[in-house]
């Protein structure tokens, strides 16, 4: 197969229209700088700093909320309780979710043993800059203190339901017959009051079913059902998927995993009323084990949510990829095995798949080439393109985002050898012409470490962490770099 070199090379110094500095000399200690989303669209960013702990063990955090253009929306302080006065006990940020003008901050107390307890929340209205409510997730815990330290075995996961509030998924593994598996799934409003609660009617022989939240938005909730038996939390397997209505909690789709092969699903997404799942598949054995280097092809399974039925199931052996030298176990000649990083559905119903090849050496991988696969509406191969990129010890793909005016999609990945020799690569795929154009940006900076993150449409975020923070005066610089793309 003919190898394709990079079609467009951009070598430039950074020039940014919008930026935000995280000041080293500012009060408190830097905790995080995170993007937050409205469904799948970037809405803004929030910086969090830990300020101080008073004599009553109240830990004060300062927040600064920015919009997607890095303009300040609001700022203020929130407080969280520390369980004891031990220096080893820390209050840490666990997650941030945004829904309908509200930011919900989740915190844990972490102890010297590494255990997490006392998951608590604070909800902020970013329009009025007021704290709406605060509380502890587990209602059995009346206060964050030593007295209740060992009372909770539940794990709580929070997700945004957009305009419909927040989803709380409480899961507890088996401890004894008196304390069995437990799973509570419910939606809450701005006052943290329950809107609806979901109770599953599905059983799996003599096992317990616990659900993992995979994706949520204004319309749907996608959950993965795991079957457990006994008190061994490693002895479980994925048995089915369900889709719920975000507004009511009603089950819309029940999808069982095919027993024909062993599946490793790399992606799950809902688009246009269809659930898409896919990844590698393996020959079935009695113990449901598999060799990660012995897959036999790619699978894509599609379910129709409205009709609650299977729409399509495609099994694609590797030998069907005619324009790449690949054996029946997914090994590309001279380049190694394939790992599939991203599968996107194009507006015309076709698919764009991004993959990287790698060699497995002991416990580490060396990543070699980059591949793109064009697939038709039934997930059959149309065209494969191979790109020459640097070998790296880690994978290169980072994230993707839409190009302006829905003209295509940009895929971002690093070729990294060391901090002084970075390459930011941006692969633009255009829907109308089906053209692929790669930009290569060399990044050389002796004074800082660089990473990238999602930004508003048409831009990429650059985070620059300064090595000599005292000299620079800043801890880090967050900036937006405008993308070069074609207008079709």
Regions from the PLM with identified roles:
Residues 4-14:
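Sec-dependent N-terminal signal peptides
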């Amino acid at each position: 197969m003919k190898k394709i070199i990079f079609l467009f090379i951009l070598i430039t110094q950074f020039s940014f229209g919008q930026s935000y500095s995280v000041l080293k000399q500012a009060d408190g200690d830097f905790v995080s700088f995170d993007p937050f989303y409205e469904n799948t669209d970037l809405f803004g960013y929030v910086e969090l700093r830990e300020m101080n702990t008073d004599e009553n063990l109240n830990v004060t955090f300062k927040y600064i909320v920015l919009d997607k253009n890095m303009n300040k929306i609001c700022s203020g302080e929130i407080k969280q309780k520390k369980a004891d006065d031990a220096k080893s006990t820390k209050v840490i940020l666990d997650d941030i979710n945004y829904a309908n003008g509200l930011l919900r901050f989740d915190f844990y107390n972490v102890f010297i043993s590494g255990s997490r307890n006392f998951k608590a929340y604070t909800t902020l209205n970013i329009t009025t800059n007021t704290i709406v409510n605060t509380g502890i997730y587990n209602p059995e815990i009346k206060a964050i203190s030593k007295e209740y330290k060992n009372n909770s075995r539940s794990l709580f996961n929070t997700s945004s339901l957009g305009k419909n509030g927040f989803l709380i998924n409480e899961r507890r593994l088996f401890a004894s017959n008196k304390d069995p598996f437990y799973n509570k799934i419910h939606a809450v409003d701005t006052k943290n009051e329950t809107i609806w609660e979901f109770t599953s009617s599905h059983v799996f022989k003599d096992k317990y079913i616990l659900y993992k939240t995979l994706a949520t938005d204004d319309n749907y909730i996608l959950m993965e059902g795991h079957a457990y038996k006994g008190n061994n939390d490693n002895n479980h397997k994925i048995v089915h998927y369900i889709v719920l209505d975000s507004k009511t909690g009603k089950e819309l789709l029940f999808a069982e995993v095919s027993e024909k092969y062993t599946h490793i699903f790399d992606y799950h997404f809902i688009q246009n009323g269809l659930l898409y799942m896919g990844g590698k598949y393996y020959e079935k054995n009695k113990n449901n084990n598999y060799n990660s280097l012995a897959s036999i092809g790619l699978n894509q399974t599609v379910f129709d949510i409205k009709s609650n039925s299977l729409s399509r199931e495609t099994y694609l052996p590797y030998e069907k990829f005619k324009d790449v030298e690949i054996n029946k176990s997914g090994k590309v000649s001279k380049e190694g095995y394939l790992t599939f990083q991203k599968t996107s559905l194009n507006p015309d119903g076709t698919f764009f798949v991004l993959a990287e090849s790698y060699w497995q050496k002991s416990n580490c991988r060396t990543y070699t080439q980059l591949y793109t696969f064009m697939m038709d509406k039934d997930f059959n191969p149309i065209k494969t393109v191979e790109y020459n990129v640097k070998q790296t010890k880690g994978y290169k793909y980072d994230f993707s985002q839409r190009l302006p005016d829905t003209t295509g999609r940009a895929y971002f990945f690093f070729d990294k050898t060391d901090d002084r020799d970075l390459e930011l690569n941006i692969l633009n795929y255009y829907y109308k012409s089906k053209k692929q154009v790669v930009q290569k940006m060399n990044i050389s900076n002796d004074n800082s470490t660089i990473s990238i993150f999602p930004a508003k449409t048409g831009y990429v975020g650059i985070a620059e962490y300064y090595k000599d923070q005292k000299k620079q005066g800043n801890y880090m610089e967050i900036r937006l770099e405008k993308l070069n793309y074609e207008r079709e």
